[in-house]
Amino acid sequence: MIGKEVTIPDIILQEEFGQPIDLQCYENLTAEAPAEQELEAEEELIQGIPYKVIATCGGGCGARLRVFVLATDAAIRSFQELLLEELQFLCPQCREEIRNGGR
């Protein structure tokens, strides 16, 4: 641009159109697939996951006790809270002692 006023020859438009962007993902989703996945996830939650729990005897002898359970994630967390707070396992010897009044 030369001067104070703009003239038409001073304006040069250079428009270049690139390739159009294809926004389609072309995924083939069926209505059954998500429902099927949800059912499988629900079955896993209902069936649970096998856990091995190792705890010490609450009767005082300190014996290690193993318990095998099948539980969901929420159930095993609740079980863990019970073991840490108010639930204690007993070995057979301590159970007999407590049952017989310590005799």
Swiss-Prot record:
Coiled-coil annotated spans: none
Short sequence motif LXCXE motif: positions: 23-27
Stretches the record annotates as E7 terminal domain: 1-47
One of the GO biological process terms: DNA-templated transcription
Keywords linked to the UniProt accession: Activator, DNA-binding, Early protein, G1/S host cell cycle checkpoint dysregulation by virus, Host cytoplasm, Host nucleus, Host-virus interaction, Inhibition of host innate immune response by virus, Inhibition of host interferon signaling pathway by virus, Interferon antiviral system evasion, Metal-binding, Modulation of host cell cycle by virus, Oncogene, Transcription, Transcription regulation, Viral immunoevasion, Zinc, Zinc-finger
Main location per the UniProt record: host cell
Motif mapping: Nuclear export signal: 76-84
SUPFAM superfamilies cross-referenced by the UniProt entry: E7 C-terminal domain-like
Modification(s) after translation: Highly phosphorylated.
GO molecular function: DNA binding; DNA-binding transcription factor activity; protein domain specific binding; zinc ion binding
Keyword Transcription regulation belongs to the record: yes
Zinc finger extent (unnamed): 57-94
GO cellular component: host cell cytoplasm; host cell nucleus
One Pfam family this sequence matches: E7
Localization in the cell: Host cytoplasm; Host nucleus
InterPro entries associated with the record: Papilloma_E7
Annotated family: Belongs to the papillomaviridae E7 protein family.
Domain comment in the entry: The E7 terminal domain is an intrinsically disordered domain, whose flexibility and conformational transitions confer target adaptability to the oncoprotein. It allows adaptation to a variety of protein targets and exposes the PEST degradation sequence that regulates its turnover in the cell.
Quaternary assembly: Homodimer. Homooligomer. Interacts with host RB1; this interaction induces dissociation of RB1-E2F1 complex thereby disrupting RB1 activity. Interacts with host EP300; this interaction represses EP300 transcriptional activity. Interacts with protein E2; this interaction inhibits E7 oncogenic activity. Interacts with host TMEM173/STING; this interaction impairs the ability of TMEM173/STING to sense cytosolic DNA and promote the production of type I interferon (IFN-alpha and IFN-beta).
Function description: Plays a role in viral genome replication by driving entry of quiescent cells into the cell cycle. Stimulation of progression from G1 to S phase allows the virus to efficiently use the cellular DNA replicating machinery to achieve viral genome replication. E7 protein has both transforming and trans-activating activities. Induces the disassembly of the E2F1 transcription factor from RB1, with subsequent transcriptional activation of E2F1-regulated S-phase genes. Interferes with host histone deacetylation mediated by HDAC1 and HDAC2, leading to transcription activation.
Protein name per Swiss-Prot or TrEMBL: Protein E7
Upper taxonomic lineage: Viruses, Monodnaviria, Shotokuvirae, Cossaviricota, Papovaviricetes
Gene name per UniProt: E7
